[in-house]
A protein has these predicted regions:
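ABC ATPase C-loop
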Residues: 189-190
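Conserved switch/coupling elements of ABC/ABC-like ATPase nucleotide-binding domains
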Residues: 247, 251-263
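Conserved ABC transporter NBD signature motif
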Residues: 92-104
Length: 375
């Protein structure tokens, strides 16, 4: 999912139609803590025969930070569009089952009504940013709810402060980094006062610093305990420490797992891997190392856990012997080969900016060289 349709890009901020209330009242009592309920939800896009997802049922309450996983094509992004009414109201698709947002049936309430209860942040923040300053951008939604000016400004300030952008409120969004623009999109959702936040791959187009910026903002929201968050994400290295629950869809878009992070990502990692579901890098590495004879109980999720587990055990004998043989063969091959590329003391400037400084490297036959660095 890269972006919503143009007509729906800002539909969460559309003013209510005549006869609608700007702030519908959610169900109270026991239902109050439940922000979202999906009951056997299936979605069939226009022109398609099969529903994807086919049957999804789960709930989200305040304090839940839910990671929604599934193989490519299982309908995760499609499902996110049903959580705030874009399906069926703006995106042509048939919906079966029931989506309830704060007790309201999403099929019979408009996107404008639902926007006060659920905000959505897409993969590409530029699809949602339309004004000339950060403050104007965050005020756009509350203004379209016809709130008093003082309330609009109060909401905008609170939202910008929560994502660390208040001091830059007069700047053009174009001056922000990718991570900054995504934080701005999150602030726009927060300013609507929505207790539920849905994020569809919010870090897909970001560098490591941008990813850190987004999750720093989300960590603060999750710590408050007053929001519910649904996260669709492929970068599980960043997401795993942040979430407290995992829901998994199979290839047909049917829920096959719903539980705590350890129960799902550790306890069912091999099953998820066979299904084509993304896993944390350290968990994938541990699965491969386990095939080579290493023992992991439990499976690691983070690099620190993987490192600690490896430090506690010697390498299996077969691995040590294979490594020694490979090392000897590599040394023989490289020593007999020639240099293909040699760089010495390279400095490069673009206009007044020095982008490379005194770089030296050598590439020989048999080398597999990776060059990494900050953007």
């Amino acid at each position: 999912m890269t972006a919503p349709p143009d007509s729906a890009a800002r539909s969460a901020s559309v003013a209510p139609a005549p006869g609608e209330t700007a702030t519908p009242k959610p169900t109270h009592g026991r239902e109050h803590a439940r922000l979202l309920q999906l009951r056997e939800v299936g979605i069939t896009h226009e022109g398609e025969d099969a529903a994807t997802p086919a049957s999804v049922s789960f709930e989200v309450s305040r304090g839940d930070v839910v990671l929604l996983l599934g193989p490519s094509g299982s309908g995760k992004s499609t499902l996110s569009l049903a959580m705030n009414g874009l399906i069926p109201h703006a995106v042509p698709a048939a919906l079966t089952g029931r989506v309830e947002v704060a007790g309201m049936d999403a099929a019979t309430h408009s996107v404008a009504q639902l926007s006060t209860q659920v905000g959505i942040v897409f993969q590409d923040p530029d699809a949602q940013l339309v004004t000339g300053t950060l403050l104007d951008e965050v005020a756009f939604g509350p203004e379209n709810l016809r709130l008093p000016a003082a309330d609009v400004l109060a909401r905008a300030e609170s939202a910008l402060r929560r994502v660390g952008l208040w001091e830059r409120r007069s700047e053009n969004p174009d001056r922000l980094s990718g991570g900054g623009r995504q934080r701005l999109a999150i602030a726009c959702a927060l300013a609507m006062g929505s207790p539920l936040l849905v994020l569809d791959e919010p870090t897909a187009n970001l560098d490591p610093r941008g990813i850190d910026d987004v999750y720093a903002a989300l960590d603060e929201l999750a710590a408050s305990g007053d929001k519910g968050i649904v996260l669709i994400e492929h970068n599980l290295d960043a997401a795993a420490p942040f979430v407290n629950r995992v829901v998994v869809l199979d290839a047909a878009g049917v829920v096959i797992a719903d539980g705590a992070v350890d129960e799902i990502l550790r306890g069912r990692a091999a099953e998820l891997h066979d299904l084509g579901v993304w896993l944390p890098t350290s968990t994938l590495a541990a699965l491969r190392l386990r095939e080579a004879g290493y023992r992991f109980d439990p499976l690691p999720i983070s690099p620190d856990e993987l490192r600690a587990a490896l430090d506690r055990q010697p390498a299996p004998a077969a691995t040590r012997e294979a490594g020694a043989d490979a090392g000897a063969a590599t040394e023989t091959r490289v020593s007999a080969s020639g240099t293909r590329i040699e760089v010495r003391g390279l400095t490069l400037r673009r206009k007044k900016t020095e982008v490379l400084t005194d770089v030296s490297l050598e590439v020989r036959d048999g080398d597999f060289l990776a060059i990494v660095g900050a953007n």
